[in-house]
């Protein structure tokens, strides 16, 4: 495929990839391969929380491929004005990472009076609002547990606009299974009714939601990571090639759960 598309007024054309942190390891690996194949159009990778990435794309940030941690926000924030469809490329689940924590003792560890636990910013990152959703769903597992987790004095991460690098360290962290597996650290798997992994529990998950801003409230769904090519992509054909290479990667080997489908118009066609 010829990716040498003319770009008026620029001598250093790049393929701009905006990617969620959960996909960064895969994207970095693919960038090296892409750059070797296409030195005329190297990939410029920008990682961030998916809500923030979508806001950047809508505001005019160069974006040829957008890889989101959550398909729902692509649908709700970008379609149909900024994108016509997307590929779901993997599933995942929420777990808790930390020294000595496991599936048998996570309640005890997190509810200890001196425990501290954190997550990403829920107002900009699906990993953050999914952690909050997991806590909200804790009542489905054990009534009263949601409030004890959400309002625990050691719960860190609910500040809306924290200064960069200001978040305190914590003993435990709510994160994705794929990231936990890659880290090599101890982690606890949560009950399926909390971990947002089971498509059969979609109706249960949908009982909770989170407002990321005044205009967008996200309803909990089984985790689906997704990829789109915005209408504003400058390098449309190259974006399709990069996206196809990404979709062909072995995501299960990287700790992701198998899940794949197309919603709306296939951006690769």
Language-model features, listed with the residues they occupy:
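Central helical "cap/lid" subdomain
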Residues: 81-87
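Short beta-strand->alpha-helix junction loop in the catalytic core
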Residues: 93
